[in-house]
Amino acid sequence: MEKFRIDFKKENGPKYIQLYKHIKNLIENSKIEASEKLPPLREMSAFLNINISTSVKAYDLLEKEKYIYKKEGSGSYIYPQASASKEVLKAVRFDLANPQANMFPVDKFKEAVAIAIEKEGETLFDYHEGLGYEPLRMSLCDYMKSLSIESEPDRIQIISGAQQGINIIVNSILNYGDVVFIEEPSYPGAIDVFKEHGVKVVGIPVLDDGIDIGILKLKLEKIKPSIIYTMPNYQNPTGVCYSEKKKKEILNLAKQFDFMIIEDDYMSDFDFNNTKIKPLRAYDEENRVIYIKSFSKILMPGLRIGFMEMPIHVRNIISRIKYSMDISTSSFTQLSLYYYMTFFGWRNHLDIIKKVYESRFKIAKKYIDSNFSDILTFRKASGGVNFFAALPKDYSSIDLKIFLESKGVKILEGPLFYYNIKAENEFRISIAHMQENEIENNLNTLKNGIIEFLSDEKNKMKYKIPN
């Protein structure tokens, strides 16, 4: 107990903050072991001669910031990753969906930057028009033809990443209390944007060939959404691809029930089964789709650049909202990307990335199909970098996450991907951030950890899920 002793000083703020900081410091400096139990609240309060409510506030703050977790009826324990920051670097990172740095075209992009500086001079660091640098928008129109999308520069808005695009649309088109339909499970970044803006969110289940059209129709007959948010190709987190029939059905429903569609696309460039897939936007003849394209999986996520392709009737409001957020996406980044796409084999880079992702996906899928069927249920991913799995119903992915982190394996828990329900037994793994020759060994490590977790009856639903 002696390590918890504090010399409370009035000038250091409220006592609960001082206690919180003291315990946090002990954790970060490995003075408390991973999964170690903290003293009970009454014992801590008596030892420090403070009110029990002070200890409660300190523990609650530690839990909120994920330094501790609570076992119902047992007490408070240190999160494994909280005291193991150095070990995280060595962890098996199934939680990361971004590409590894060795896949970035750094040398060629560096040359593109040099050309941009030489050709543009000081204008490289000035603002460009609100929609974005026009030659880049023209190049993007040419690029979209490879995705079977015909467009024009006036329909392109350069954005600082896909999440900003969603944010712009919500601020442009939606009012407080409007209804948005989303896939469930769905992309956490989009869920966060909808939560922040106070819109009403209705979840529609995702099946093996895309969103559940039957349930979607039932919901549409009772509720009028302004927008449906969807990832039709290699959906995050399931890896599911919508069938062509389902894409056309959604567009017909959009016309019938008069709603817009946000299509969030980050992997339509790739065909994982030698089948050329098209974005939903490629089938849109009624100007219902606002198409968001992120380069996070196909270029370098740190560039924070993407684009929206939009119907003309929403262009002005979207451009105004974009301007109010950051005036324009970095001119330096826009022009550097333009010169990279123009002079440095952009299409060749896409072909290389496609082969890498396709090979990794096939290795992972083969291993999963052969080795996990007796312990987990996986969604039928068509491609991409993610796999979505379910534990038996009486086990929580929060519990599994905590258990695996103590073994050096990191996953993402299912509740992150839901708005309206708590999918406690589901979780996502990604093979994006690992080498091809690591995948089978890493999956084997994951499998052994899950088998060990499931073999202990005490692991059945007992941890309190942190807020």
What are these regions (language model features)?
Residues M1-A116, E120, F125, L136, ...:
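N-terminal basic, amphipathic alpha-helical segments
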Residues I182, G203, I261-E263, L337, ...:
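Hydrophobic residues in well-ordered beta-strands that form the structural core
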Residues G73, E152-P153, K380-V385:
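Short Gly/Ser/Thr- and Asp/Glu-enriched loop/turn motifs at secondary-structure junctions
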Residues Y229-M231, I262-E263, D269, K293, ...:
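Short beta-strand segments
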